[in-house]
Amino acid sequence: LSAIKGFYPLDVAQDETTREFFEEFSKENPGVKIDVLVHAIGFAPRSCFDRPILFVEDADINTAMTISANSLQRCLKFAMPYLSQGSSTITLTYAASTRFVPSYGIMSMAKAALECWTRELACHLGPHGHRVNSISSGPIRTIAAQGIPGFDRILDHVEANAPLRRNVDQSDVAGTTLWLASPLSAGVTGQCIHVDAGYSITMVPQSIMDA
């Protein structure tokens, strides 16, 4: 990593800017191949959360899907010439892709699409020796999470009901990312790995039984 030069801005909503991003990376780092590509991009316009989902504008839905989901395909399309043999791409999703989470709105659809892209791209890139997986993390206290109404109550609920009786943190996700990035996971592709202290396997909250 010490050989990699600089930071490069990227507008993932456009083909041209994405192509230029990887071309510039290659130009500034001649001979360097990409072993690991981490796609940690998510965005939806504020208006997607300020009104009922039935009334979200098409343009705002398209923006959320383009940046949060379709950008994975766009990035890999232009990264392909620069990927090393056996490369690993990792993207970040959330349990709202398969179940209702209040206030998550259009991002639920974006995360569901992102997981579909993970499977599709894994199948298309697998014959070329490239792996694609996603990590579905439990709720973590981040700057972005501060804008979610009732987030502290969500953390309390998960801690009380997850099989491990705790919330996960950045180090849990980092550890799984490291594993997916390494040869230790060489036989894993197209998967969604849940890092949530086991919360995603539960149905009836333990707190109900304990009441």
What would you call each of these model-derived segments?
Residues T17-E20, T63-T66, N70-F78, R119, ...:
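Conserved mid-core alpha-helix of short-chain dehydrogenase/reductase
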Residues G126, R131, V188-G190:
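Short, small/polar-rich loop/turn modules that mediate ligand/substrate recognition or access, typified
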Residues S2-N62, P81, S103-I106, Q146-G150, ...:
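Conserved mid-core segment of classical short-chain dehydrogenase/reductases
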Residues P127, S137-A162, T202-A211:
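A glycine/serine/threonine-rich, flexible loop-to-helix segment
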Residues A162-V173, L184:
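A conserved structural motif in NAD(P)-dependent oxidoreductases
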Residues L178, T189-A211:
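Short C-terminal tail/terminal secondary-structure segment
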Residues G42-P81, Q85-P127, P139-R141, Y199:
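Catalytic loop of short-chain dehydrogenase/reductase
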Residues R131-R141, A181, H194-D196:
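Conserved SDR Rossmann-fold cofactor-binding beta-strand/turn motif
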